């Protein structure tokens, strides 16, 4: 695992709790942000069901294999790949890719192909990061206003995380 991944993983884990089963979360049961509904075959669920500890290595490996690598974060300039990873952990890969596509000015189809990667690589990193920040906030505003009763409990936490991670990543450039 790369240094870039390890650094952003540690940041993201500050925002992802241990075991959570919030009734308003469409992801249902989660462990350190891993949704049982989205990832029912993750081996950590077996350990949790048996009341056994889940190693940090198992969680880290999951995020590396299921998020960092498919998102091709290492191929993106820092801190764009890191910010994309953070958003994907919270919203899922498809939504995160659509959002970075909007920020990069390409069709938002949720597919991370050569057009999207080219647009990301050609972008001014600082400008792209500010656009990505704005699109992330807009996403949270939109889903919260559409399903207020379900999501308003999460809204301020989402916005806080979005801004804090952005600020931290931009200060490390």
Model-derived features with residue positions:
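Cell-wall polysaccharide-cleaving catalytic domain and substrate-binding groove, primarily
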Residues: 1-173
């Amino acid at each position: 695992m790369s240094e870039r991944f390890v650094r952003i993983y540690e940041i993201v884990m500050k925002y992802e709790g241990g075991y959570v089963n919030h009734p308003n979360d469409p992801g249902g049961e989660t462990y350190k942000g891993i949704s049982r509904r989205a990832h029912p075959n993750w081996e950590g669920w077996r350990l949790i069901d048996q009341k056994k500890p889940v190693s940090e290595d198992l969680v880290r490996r999951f995020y590396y294999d299921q998020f960092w690598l498919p998102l091709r974060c290492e191929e993106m300039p820092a801190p764009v790949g890191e910010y994309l990873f953070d958003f994907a952990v919270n919203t899922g890969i498809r939504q995160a890719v659509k959002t970075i596509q909007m920020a990069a000015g390409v069709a938002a189809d949720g597919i991370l192909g050569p057009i999207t990667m080219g647009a990301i690589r050609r972008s001014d990193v600082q400008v792209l990061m500010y656009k990505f920040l704005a699109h992330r906030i807009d996403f949270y505003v939109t889903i919260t206003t559409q399903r207020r009763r379900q999501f308003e409990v999460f809204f301020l936490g989402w916005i806080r995380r979005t801004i804090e991670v952005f600020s931290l990543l931009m200060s490390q450039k």
